[in-house]
Curated annotation (Swiss-Prot):
Taxonomic classification: Bacteria, Bacillati, Bacillota, Bacilli, Bacillales
EC annotation from Swiss-Prot or TrEMBL: 2.7.7.-
Name under which the protein is recorded: Probable uridylyltransferase SSP0716
Superkingdom: Bacteria
Record family assignment: Belongs to the UDPGP type 1 family.
MF annotations from Gene Ontology: uridylyltransferase activity
Positions that bind UTP: 99-102, 113, 178, 204, 235, 344
Disulfide cross-links: none
Length: 395
């Protein structure tokens, strides 16, 4: 039996009505789940991020980051960075971390986004091919850590098995899952998913390091002598996975965080790399006044190297949640399936930047290194991704 007094206190009394329609099993699961939740924290999230949502319009303490521009490097500098990078990779100083917890829903595709194929080559394979090329160059397999989610973990692993890991050594491919967090209605109420459980969604890419630690892989990296983690996501089809130049740049600069950026277009809805209160960080486009966003010259493209010692030091530090509103399937009061705007709470990995003591940015050419695949048609679509991959001779 649910505690009516507690539920009323936190605006969740509707669950008592849901409980009346449930089987004994479902009631038990609901009760157990509610016991594991901190309803006060959930109410605070709702109040802070939805009811009192703030947009950053005062940037008096926000400045441009210091950055290098790849196109301004001399031939000698490029060769030197590449030499340093290949040597570091050969010595096992880098691991690669891929964030791939999403589904291909917006592409009109059922399945993990990474298994979506463009002209018979999946997004996973595009990245695996680059790691295989590095193996040929260095003689070393780089450990590849792939973050999945509850919604795609099993399918992702089965996909890799069906493709024989694209010829990569399966002992060097490691999967782990990101955590979930409850979703809420626009009234701040917990909702039920189509299986009559409290609806949860992946907690955003910011949980990547805690999940990596929980899986034991952070310790494994340390034991293996890894010094840097190269991080990227599955969305960018032109990503250069641990390209030797960036590896060498990372290794020589020896910063807590080394990041890639591109020159943003006016009005482009990507986060901006900025220096705020003496710390390099990312301000999300949705949290910035559009006119102010256009003042900054470096867009975040989700490609970074993190010093492993830095991650080990800060992995337990708290990160703030951010709000996203998505249409999600859920049960109505009669247990019918409906789709409604739902509040998702997400951690962003770049909020860990606030704890870094050193940071450097390398601006790279957009046309060579950035082509996000987000939509079935139009902007950032299958068509644009296909054209860019062909232009760069990647398919």
């Amino acid at each position: 039996m649910l505690d009516k007094k507690t539920l009323e206190k936190f605006n969740q009394e509707h669950l008592i009505e849901f409980e009346k329609l449930m089987s004994s099993n479902e009631k038990e699961h609901l009760s157990e789940k509610l016991e594991s939740l901190n309803l006060a924290d959930i109410r605070n999230l709702y109040n802070d991020l939805y009811l009192n949502k703030k947009v950053i319009d005062d940037v008096s303490s926000v400045n441009e980051v210091k950055y290098d521009v790849k196109s301004e490097f001399t031939v000698d500098e490029i060769e030197q960075y590449e030499k340093i990078g290949l040597d570091a990779i050969k010595k096992g100083k880098f691991a690669v971390l891929l964030m791939a917890g999403g589904q291909g829903t917006r592409l009109g595709y059922k399945g993990p986004k990474g298994s979506f194929e463009i002209e018979d080559t999946s997004l996973f394979e595009i990245q695996a091919k680059q790691l295989l090329a590095l193996k040929e160059q260095t003689g070393q397999y780089i450990d590849w850590y792939i973050m999945t989610s509850k919604i795609n973990d099993k399918e992702t692993q089965l996909y890799f098995e069906s493709k024989n890991y694209f010829g990569y050594d399966r002992d060097h491919v490691h999967f782990f899952m990101q955590d979930n967090i409850v979703a809420l209605s626009e009234e701040g109420k917990l909702v039920l998913d189509v299986d009559s459980n409290i609806l949860e969604t992946p907690n955003g890419n910011g949980g990547v390091f805690k999940s990596l630690a929980k899986s034991g892989y952070l310790d494994e990296m340390t034991e293996n002598g890894v010094e840097y983690i190269f991080l990227n996501n599955i969305d960018n089809v032109l990503v250069k996975v641990l390209d030797p130049l960036f590896a060498g740049y990372t290794f020589q600069k020896s910063m807590d965080i080394t990041t890639k950026s591109i020159q943003p277009k006016d009005g482009e809805s990507v986060g901006r790399l900025v220096n705020a209160n003496q710390k390099d960080t990312v301000l999300e486009y949705s949290e910035l006044d559009p006119e102010i966003a256009n003042e900054f010259n470096n867009a975040n493209i989700g490609i970074h190297s993190f010093k492993l010692a830095f991650i080990n030091n800060v992995v337990d530090n708290d990160l703030p949640y951010h709000l996203a509103i998505k249409n999600l399937k859920q049960l109505d009061e009669d247990f019918g399936v409906i789709e409604l705007p739902t509040l998702k709470f997400e951690l962003f990995y770049f909020d860990i930047f606030q704890y870094a003591h050193s940071f450097v940015t390398l601006q790279v050419p957009r046309e060579e290194e950035f082509s996000p695949l987000k939509n079935k048609e139009g902007k950032d679509s299958v068509e644009t991704a296909t054209a860019d991959l062909k232009r760069m001779n990647m398919i």
